[in-house]
């Protein structure tokens, strides 16, 4: 990692659209409603053993917040929020409890990693879930066209190895897409236009933070 400070913000995925760049080329972008986030706690090396800031985002009915969590928000002097996430940072001097963060934490051209929950697909077979080829369509193949085939020997090893790719529930996993560029920051409307696709459904929670690979360039 470089000495460049890590930045991050929570937001909501609004969907995809396309815009034109300075050379009149079409650029596919994902629109993220970034923030506003509020800093509710600061972790320090001396007290907690690591440096991080705790960010809160999203409206919630105060009656749905339990007492310990409500007390934490009260101590920070902010109203309760729906989502709370910690962001590891090397230096917490730029943050203070109660501080509000908006889309302006990033600049045009910054490289970011985006984390979200992928779309749930339900129970899926091996061809859809793992990309298996399947079995032959003819030449004696009977009613097993989409079956996975053997999952292990009968006597040796006499068991199914851990990690065997099989049918099961697909999606709803935590996914991170790395090294995406911020095409444009719309500070007035609190929007980030991120080049390319990001994980999750429309309206889903996403975490946008400085790219890890190659050091933070934002």
Swiss-Prot record:
InterPro entries in UniProt: Ribosomal_uL3, Ribosomal_uL3_bac/org-type, Ribosomal_uL3_CS, Transl_B-barrel_sf
Keyword Metal-binding (UniProt): no
Stretch list, region Disordered: 132-152
PROSITE patterns reported for this sequence: RIBOSOMAL_L3
Gene3D superfamilies for this protein: 3.30.160.810, Translation factors
GO molecular function per UniProt: rRNA binding; structural constituent of ribosome
A cellular component term, taken from the record's GO annotations: cytosolic large ribosomal subunit
UniProt KW keywords: Ribonucleoprotein, Ribosomal protein, RNA-binding, rRNA-binding
PANTHER family to which the protein is assigned, alphabetical: 50S RIBOSOMAL PROTEIN L3 (PTHR11229), LARGE RIBOSOMAL SUBUNIT PROTEIN UL3C (PTHR11229:SF16)
NCBIfam families registered for this protein in UniProt: L3_bact
Family: Belongs to the universal ribosomal protein uL3 family.
Role summary: One of the primary rRNA binding proteins, it binds directly near the 3'-end of the 23S rRNA, where it nucleates assembly of the 50S subunit.
Protein name per UniProt: Large ribosomal subunit protein uL3
